[in-house]
Amino acid sequence: MALYEHVFLARQDVTSQQVESMIDTYKGVIEANGGKVEKTEMWGVKSLAYRIKKNRKAHFTLLNIDAPPAALAEMERQMRISEDILRFLTIRVEALETEPSAMMQKRDRDERKDRERGRRRDEDGFSGDRNEEN
């Protein structure tokens, strides 16, 4: 079977639970056609470079798929029909990544920086409450 990386963008007004149910639906399509989804990553809501179908933001999701081409074609057909999916892109790869993608690593790095900034504020005596001294 062929290996694929598949990214899709869901509308911004869809909830995270609805995105998870979409992922489960598309996993079911792949598995029903003889494939399997190796890894899923939800990258969260991100700004788009330009408006797509009147949306400025979208839920970004990555699926690593090991499936025959027919299974992928069926999943893409269902994505074209869905109004909640703005765009999708599927790329055939030689090997699937097992570690977190670059987007997840960037998010972890940003969260770590935010925690360090918070620690520095605490060390400087900043508590966030301006009326504490009065």
UniProtKB/Swiss-Prot annotation:
Residues 105-134 have a biased composition (Basic and acidic residues). Transmembrane segments: none annotated. The keyword RNA-binding applies. It holds the Pfam family Ribosomal_S6. The keyword rRNA-binding applies. One of its GO terms (biological process) is translation. GO terms for molecular function: small ribosomal subunit rRNA binding; structural constituent of ribosome. Coiled coil: none annotated. Residues 99-134 are annotated as: Disordered. One of its GO terms (cellular component) is cytosolic small ribosomal subunit. Keywords: Ribonucleoprotein, Ribosomal protein, RNA-binding, rRNA-binding. Belongs to the bacterial ribosomal protein bS6 family. HAMAP family: Ribosomal_bS6. Binds together with bS18 to 16S ribosomal RNA. This is Small ribosomal subunit protein bS6. It comes from Methylobacterium nodulans (strain LMG 21967 / CNCM I-2342 / ORS 2060).
